[in-house]
Regions:
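Hydrophobic transmembrane alpha-helices
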Residues: 2-68
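Hydrophobic alpha-helical transmembrane segments
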Residues: 11, 36-41, 78-82, 100-105, ...
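Short helix-perturbing small/polar motifs within transmembrane alpha-helices
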Residues: 103-148
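Alpha-helical transmembrane-segment detector that highlights a single hydrophobic TM helix
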Residues: 61-80, 84
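Membrane-water interface at transmembrane helix exits
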Residues: 25-29, 49, 54, 88, ...
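Membrane-interface helix termini and inter-helical loops of multi-pass transporters
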Residues: 1-4, 153-165
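Interfacial aromatic-anchored transmembrane helix boundaries in multi-pass membrane proteins
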Residues: 51-60, 83-114
Length: 170
């Protein structure tokens, strides 16, 4: 679900990049020294999981692990995912350098949302297997939702692409 450079309007790219930069700055300010190794491992997991592709009809899907990263890292997900996205953009050509802030928001914001959902008392009362499924599903769902919304509001010609992406991913 990487957005390449030049796909979005400059205004959308700038606004979402600023939001991502603020979130990243907050994550840097609150991370504890003992959380750094776990953040590094989560970043490596995110990077490596992107290599595992599963054929699905006319397309393919790959693991993103947003729910897992989110429940372990919370707001520090912005740090782990940014490092992995930079490596993916520079080494593999996934996404782009200019759109990295948008891709960070699409990936890290759902991880933080899942973290907060997982902390609720109601969510903790759900059967463990269902809860684990929901952690994975909700991470992918929110990432898809953010991607679709960003495409939809960026350019009118992306409206049908946004609907297609939502249909394939959900």
């Amino acid at each position: 679900m990487h957005i390449a450079d030049g796909v979005l309007t400059p205004e959308i790219t700038a606004v979402i990049t600023v939001v991502s930069a603020i979130a990243f700055y907050k994550a840097i300010r609150i991370i504890k020294e003992e959380e750094i190794p776990l953040t590094a491992v989560a970043s490596a997991m995110f990077f490596i999981a992107s290599f595992i592709h599963i054929p699905f009809g006319v397309t393919q899907i790959h693991l993103i692990l947003l729910g897992v990263i989110g429940i372990f890292l919370g707001f520090s997900s912005f740090i782990a995912i940014l490092i992995a996205l930079i490596l993916q953009a520079l080494l593999l050509g996934y996404g782009g350098v200019v759109s990295i802030g948008v891709n960070l928001f699409i990936m890290a914001a759902p991880a933080v949302i899942v973290y907060h959902i997982n902390k609720t008392e109601i969510f903790q009362k759900i059967n463990e297997k269902i809860r684990f499924f929901l952690i994975g599903f909700l991470g992918a769902f929110f990432a898809t939702l953010f991607l679709v919304a960003i495409l939809y509001f960026s350019k009118a010609e992306y409206e049908w692409a946004a609907y297609s992406i939502f249909g394939v991913n959900i």
